[in-house]
Amino acid sequence: KAVLAAKDFNQASQLLKQNLGSMANAQEKAKAYDYVTKLALKTFDAQNAIEAQNVQAKMLKQKITPYDTIAYYQSAYDATVNGLECVKYDAQPNEKGKVKPKFTEALTPSLTNTRMQLVNAGNYYAQRNDQDNVLKYWGMFLDTDDNPLFAKAKEGEKQYLGQVAYYTALYANQAKLYDKAEKYADIAMKD
């Protein structure tokens, strides 16, 4: 209940981590993760709206509004990670042994969108030679590639999936994360 009373993502996320083990069942965990995901989406949506307005402003040669790029990308990551946890718990059986997902359907479009932004986040950090963040964002994108939740987005990802996987494999290799480098190289070779 403390998680659901938190007003911001960081506080709610902290409370969730502290109280996860004491939550009664998977449904309670799913509800908490859904709430934390929605807090991350609130930040993401606010920054996304500014970015969308900026695209239009560029076309009309109007003033561009600055937005918090780092918060935008971090909130996309946070929403994706916590949303996937919500979906995991949402798919578990209740006390009667029945699986009745309550949050997955509503979260899927938002999570598909935030996951796609992980590619842009990786590009942003690649331009700044920030290896850790490239691996964080592109790695999360690739690590969730086989998640059935994102099956409908597969067609749209085909145009850049192999390239993202190739460069992520290079970054992972440079970081001496050979298991990840091999995994990402395998994804790239399927392209």
Describe each PLM feature range.
Residues 1-51:
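Start-of-domain marker
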Residues 39-132, 136, 140-163, 167, ...:
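Short coil/linker segments at helix-helix boundaries
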